[in-house]
Amino acid sequence: MRTFNYSAIKEQKWDSDVLGLIAAIYKEAGKQELYLKQRPEELEKLVEIAKIQSTEASNAIEGIVTTSTRIRQLVEEKTTPRNRDEQEIAGYRDVLSIIHESFDAIPITQNYILQLHKILYSHMNNPLAGRTKSVQNYITATYPDGHVETLFTPLAPYETPEALDRICEEYNRVIGNMELEPLIAIPVFIHDFLCIHPFNDGNGRMSRLLTTLLLYRNGFYVGKYISLEAKIAKNKDLYYDALAQAQTGWHEGIEDVVPFIKYLLGTILAAYKDFEDRVVLVETKLHALEMVRRASKNRIGRFNKQDIRELCPSLSDSSIEGALRKLIAAGELKKEGKGKNTCYFRLN
C-alpha cells in the first residue's frame, strides 16, 4: 500500500523556477485583490465567461462536447440536457457553481469529495456516482494504428478509500499547521488524487474542480475570472506529459512531482497574467473601436471574434463586429475565412 507523508515535502530543495513561479503568483494575487476592491461590478462580467469556458473546456478534454450555443444555455440554466454529454456538462456546471458560492464551507475530506462526484452525475442514472471505483482502472494511450498502451496503473479498488482518506488528512494537516506552502501542497494533492484515480469515471474533471476548490480555499481566486480549465485544454499535451513524468515511481514513493508542480503553477500564473490584461481593458473607459484595437494587440497570430469577446466582456457582439470591420477598413487587420472559420490577424 502506498504511504503518504506531506511533511517530508518541506525538506525538499526547490529550484529557482518553482520559487520564481510561487513569488510571481503571490504578486499577481495581490494585484487582483486591489482590482477587485476598486472595480467589483465591472469584473463580474468576467465571471460568467469563465464559467462557460471552464465547463466547456474541462468536459471537452474528456471528449464530452456539445455546441457553443448549447454550452452557454446549459451554464446559464436556460435549457435542460438533451443527451448524455449534456447531462455530464450540466453536472459539471452544478459542482462548479457550488464551489464558486460555498468553497469556504466545503472541507477537504473523502465524504465531501464523494458528494461532489455524486452531484457531477446528478443529471443521469449512474449507480456509481458518489462511490469509489468498483473495478481496476488504467491510464492508457491509443495510437493511430489502434493499439492501446497502458501508461499507468492506479491503485486497486480495495486500496482506494483508505488512500483518499490519507491524502485528505495529510493535506489538511500541513495546511492547518502551516507546514507547507499551499502552492506546493495543492499540486501534490491533485497529483496524488490522479494517481489514485478513485472513480470509475470522472477523475480528470474532478481533479480540475478540486484544483479550483483548493485554490479558492487558500485565497487564489483567479479561476473565478479566468478559466484554468481552458488553459489546460489549450496545452493538454503538456498537461499529460507533466503528469506522466511525475507518475513514474509513484507506487514506490520515489516519484518526482516537480514537473507537475511547475506545470500547474505555470498555468495559474498565466491565468493571472490574462486577468491583468482583461482588467486593463475593462477599467479604462474606451470606445468600442479602441477597446477592440487594444485587445487585438494582445493577440499573437490569428484570432477570432470569441478571443476578442473574452477580452472585452462589456461589449456586445454587434459592437465587436463593427469595430473589427473598421479596423479592417483602416488596414490594421486582415480577415480570413467565412462563417465559423472566420479569423483575423494584425498587419502592423
Kindly label every feature range from the protein language model:
Residues M1-N348:
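FIC/Doc superfamily catalytic core
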